[in-house]
């Protein structure tokens, strides 16, 4: 299985699929799956290509999810090996997307192929959800596929996202959930004027200080067994014209919350509105909800993944919900248990991104064992 994984990973890496350009990656995968009797459905939205490939028609449905798009390479002269050459040196595969996530995508595909070959009459359904819009806008990829599936009431019970979850060694971390993410764009209105005549103006920076102190020190919750406490950070703040003699007429504050399952986006919005009213600030605010929190807890998929990792790596993984958002947040909306498991994340989005060849082989084994536990007849 490892040999096939590496060959496919190299083929994918050699295609410069900077988001959202797929560069033929999904076609390569689709042709392989078609030979094994997978039903293929192309779901393009705008300039994004999505593939929904299934084998079997019964419940439960196990989804392997991944993306073919990669981030830009930056200055190519800084790379030890050309970023789209997929060089293997001393057991390490180099290239943009090697770790995030063409390597683990290849492992997911080969694991599904191998399982179907060995178990052609398996129970349930295996599905691969592959998109070319994860690294950029993430507006026309997995979220659109999920909307399509939900509209026709197609069930998904379990989903394994091949994101690079491991920290120091393969298998040390499984993501069994993610925090929600919501961003506020706040404008506090004042009255512009000359700094020498403050009585004729109203400085929104000054009037907002107490509010901003309350906003940044408020304790939203204490977290829980699976999540750390909700965190708020001011990301951008701007006021003034750049001149030292003009009192600004408006203050702009952009802030983000990474929130756990102890609160909801509505609770957050209402509390911020309450604070603004308390401090009597003339304002306007808009919100962008990037994703709701999701949690697989200690469900069947988590148990299957932990057991598979232990069998293959001889390591007991730590369950973790930290880090940024992933496409798992969209699949979780279907009521599915979602986990993320993949190779080390130490080099993702960096110059000289790379992954261990041995680790990719083991990823494939883990994915195969998950299917065995959940779908073997």
Curated annotation (Swiss-Prot):
Reactions listed under catalytic activity: N-succinyl-(2S,6S)-2,6-diaminopimelate + H2O = (2S,6S)-2,6-diaminopimelate + succinate
Transmembrane segments: none
A single MF term (Gene Ontology): acetylornithine deacetylase activity
SUPFAM superfamilies from the UniProt entry: Bacterial exopeptidase dimerisation domain (SSF55031), Zn-dependent exopeptidases (SSF53187)
Swiss-Prot/TrEMBL keywords: Amino-acid biosynthesis, Cobalt, Diaminopimelate biosynthesis, Hydrolase, Lysine biosynthesis, Metal-binding, Zinc
Cofactor note: Binds 2 Zn(2+) or Co(2+) ions per subunit.
Binding residues annotated for Zn(2+) 2, in chain numbering: 100, 135, 349
Active site positions, chain numbering: 69, 134
Names of required cofactors: Zn(2+); Co(2+)
Gene Ontology biological process terms from the UniProt entry: diaminopimelate biosynthetic process; L-arginine biosynthetic process; lysine biosynthetic process via diaminopimelate
Function (record text): Catalyzes the hydrolysis of N-succinyl-L,L-diaminopimelic acid (SDAP), forming succinate and LL-2,6-diaminopimelate (DAP), an intermediate involved in the bacterial biosynthesis of lysine and meso-diaminopimelic acid, an essential component of bacterial cell walls.
Protein family according to the UniProt entry: Belongs to the peptidase M20A family. DapE subfamily.
Protein name per its UniProtKB record: Succinyl-diaminopimelate desuccinylase
Organism expressing this protein natively: Actinobacillus pleuropneumoniae serotype 5b (strain L20)
Gene this chain is encoded by: dapE
């Amino acid at each position: 299985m490892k040999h096939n994984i590496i060959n496919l990973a190299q083929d994918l890496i050699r295609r410069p699929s900077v988001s959202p350009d797929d560069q033929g990656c999904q076609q390569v995968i689709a042709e392989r799956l078609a030979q094994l009797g997978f039903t293929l459905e192309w779901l393009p939205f705008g300039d994004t290509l999505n593939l929904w490939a299934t084998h079997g028609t019964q419940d439960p449905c196990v989804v392997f999810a991944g993306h073919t798009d990669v981030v830009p390479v930056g200055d190519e002269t800084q790379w030890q090996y050309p970023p789209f050459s997929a060089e293997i040196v001393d057991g390490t595969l180099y290239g943009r997307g090697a770790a995030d996530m063409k390597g683990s995508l290849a492992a997911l595909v080969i694991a599904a192929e191998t399982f179907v070959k060995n178990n052609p009459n398996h129970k349930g359904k295996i599905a691969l959800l592959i998109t070319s819009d994860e690294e950029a806008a993430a507006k026309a990829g997995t979220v659109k596929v999920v909307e399509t599936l939900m509209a026709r009431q197609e069930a998904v019970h379990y989903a394994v996202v091949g994101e690079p979850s491991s920290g120091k060694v393969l298998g040390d971390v499984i993501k069994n959930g993610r925090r929600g993410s919501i961003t506020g764009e706040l404008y506090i209105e004042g009255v512009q004027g000359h700094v020498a005549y403050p009585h004729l103006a109203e400085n929104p920076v000054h009037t907002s200080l107490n509010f901003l102190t309350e906003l940044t020190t408020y304790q939203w919750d204490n977290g829980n067994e699976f999540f750390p406490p909700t965190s708020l950070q001011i990301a951008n703040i701007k006021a003034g014209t750049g001149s030292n003699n003009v009192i600004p007429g408006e203050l702009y504050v952009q802030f983000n919350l990474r929130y756990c399952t102890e609160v909801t986006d509505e609770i957050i919005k209402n509390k911020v509105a309450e604070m603004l009213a308390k401090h009597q600030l003339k304002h306007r605010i808009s919100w962008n909800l990037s994703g709701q929190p999701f949690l697989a807890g200690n469900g069947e998929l988590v148990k299957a993944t932990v057991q598979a990792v232990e069998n293959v790596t001889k390591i007991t993984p730590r369950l973790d919900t930290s880090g940024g958002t992933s496409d798992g947040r969209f699949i979780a909306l279907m009521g599915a248990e979602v986990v993320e498991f993949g190779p080390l994340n130490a080099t993702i989005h960096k110059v000289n991104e790379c992954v261990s060849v041995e680790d990719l082989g083991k990823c494939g084994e883990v994915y195969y064992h998950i299917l065995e536990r959940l779908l073997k007849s």
